[in-house]
Amino acid sequence: MRTIVRRLCNPPVLLGILLVCRLALLILAPHTDPSESRYAEIARKMVETGDWITPQFDYGVPFWAKPPLSMWMSALGIELFGVNEFGSRIFIFVGALGVLALVADAARRELGKEAGWTAAAVLTGMPLFFYCSAAVMTDLALLLGTTLTMVCFRGAMRGGPRWSGYGVFAGLAIGLLAKGPLALVISLPPIAAWLLITGRWRTAWRSLPWFTGTVVMLLLALPWYLAAERKTPGFLDYFLMGEHWNRFTVRGWQGDLYGNAHPVAPGMIWVYLLLGSFPWCLGLLRARPASWRGFRIWAMAHHGRGLYWILWALWPVAFFTPARNIIATYPLPALPALAILLAEFHGTTTPASLPKPVPRPLSPMLAGITLAFAAWAIVVSLFLPELAPKQSERALIRRFERERSPGDRLIYYGPRKYSSEFYTEGGIDHTVSAGTIAERLDSPGRTFVALPSYWLPLIPPPVRRRLLPVASWGPGPSLYVERTDMPDMSGIDPSRTSPIGN
């Protein structure tokens, strides 16, 4: 038993198990509403319509909220592997492997071979990275860009190859195409602060191709911005002012064209960071300096190595501390630096500034919690979906496909469900009007109606009596089919029917 536990705590073994678990979830877990399925459906529409410039929120409705890099990645997978979970997620996962490779290489160069494995295993075991590493969202693409920039800048300052300098600007271009100017705000201030504290401005000026690198960055990112504004005028105003200013400064911002604001108290991002890095953040609890002088020695040693990791880890969180409209994925850019710090504390030598050896992050307890989390994610996603924090319409769509006959149709009543659009490849209708349900029931062919259970009382009784239950999924959606033994409803005005209960 001890041998098994010891092997599971070995960083390469733990990393391999976690990646296999994530790959299994990538293939088997359904797309959930609203975020992941929304981006997956946008990518599917991109392939269907052949419009790779303007992402579409609905057919003919531009999606201005985010640049298209992550949607390009998903659309490429759908183009190659079909409209399924694997196709829409695989290149997001490839991007995550790129992040792990960058983090492992940086830790290996700075701290040794073992530290590279440790940093990669710790990062993969953090719940926030584990989820985002194959989720169809924009966050992983942004992380790839910021990590490339930060790792390559550190490499260039240590006398690395010339491509390291160009990697800084390539990372910024990736970030601009993933989430826009936010990539610059996340990457450049910690670099500037590090240069200011260490005084290595001249080295930075000599080590980086500032002019040609900037040209490369603009050549990679600017053409899409110009093409998007030309194709759908008004994009730049909404994207730059709305998404990059009002979203973070206006509590409960109502200008979001594609969703709802997420009002939170200032400082909530620190809670998200702790939850997103648990349990590995516990490895920092005893990493307290014995004195300010000892901390300075450690932080400035090896060309300011410790200071660089700290600034990289703290800045994304500090920047969003006053923000009133954030979601739980916002601490993600800080996690690679946090993983490298933990890898350093995991080493056999203890930094001189620390009073005593820190607890090794790859302890049986931390590794066990991480593996339990991964196992629970698989069990919930595949066997207990009603316990999942987010729901999917995949089971309902599969049931409809089994029940349907030629000429049958499905209409969704209630909030828009992007996963239903993805799994039917756009082959459903959506309405919030009970009158539309009545019209479809009077049309030729058999009608299936899907709706959340709590929307059923909103359907007038004459309409509801024509629906026969097919299946329901706990507190989630329910599927109904048109009854064939009811009289025709032509001539009934649903708007004039009595409310439920009368």
Predicted stretch roles:
Residues 19-24, 215-219, 371-373, 377-386:
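Hydrophobic alpha-helical targeting segments used for export or membrane insertion
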Residues 52, 136, 482, 495-498:
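A detector of low-complexity, intrinsically disordered, Ser/Thr/Gly/Pro/Ala-rich segments
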Residues 327-331, 342-343, 348-351, 362-366, ...:
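Extended hydrophobic-aromatic, low-complexity segments
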Residues 347-379:
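Signature aromatic-anchored transmembrane alpha helix within multi-pass, membrane-resident enzymes
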Residues 348, 486-491:
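Short, charged low-complexity linker/loop segments at the C-terminal edge of domains
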Residues 489-502:
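Compositionally biased, proline/threonine/alanine/serine-rich low-complexity intrinsically disordered stretches
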